[in-house]
Amino acid sequence: MASVLILNGPNLNLLGSRSPGVYGTTTFAELEELCRREAGQLGLEAVFRQSNHEGQLIDWIQEAGPEAEAGRSVGAVLNPGALTHTSIALRDAIEAVRLPVIEVHISNVRGREDFRHQSWISPVARGVIIGLGIHGYPLAIRALHLLSGSA
């Protein structure tokens, strides 16, 4: 069974309690269940992870590249959180391993503060989904499945 990696960056573990007017009231555990259900319906195994540390996210991306190249993974859904706007290292890791990535943001970052408009990840992502709340995650999982040719 092929997998789909779902990576969540800093502070996403606080979903449901952090700024519910911006990010909604769905908890991180509920988001994980939503992703696992969507992946399962597509015959994929969801590998769901979160870290507040840039280096850990980079390690997971580097590990996932060979899995995708070998056909054991359809790619990664990545919500880098605030690292979107600051992490060239995360961008470089994605580019280096040629991992298919769909960048996801729960809120519409284009409608928020100016500093959130810059993404270092978008240029190396296969696609970007923003502003659709938690629904962006299952859409990204489905997109990776379709783009992999597994559908």
Question: Model-found features: residue ranges?
Answer:
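Short beta-strand elements at the ligand-binding edges of bilobed clamshell
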Residues: 116-134
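Extreme N-terminal starter segment of soluble prokaryotic enzymes
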Residues: 1-4
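Active-site-proximal loop->helix
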Residues: 91-93, 112-121
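Mid-chain, well-packed structural core segment of small domains
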Residues: 72-110
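Short beta->alpha junction loops
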Residues: 45-55
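Short catalytic helix/loop segments, enriched in acidic residues and glycine
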Residues: 21-40
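A charged, well-structured terminal subsegment
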Residues: 130-151
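Short, electropositive alpha-helical surface patch
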Residues: 56-79
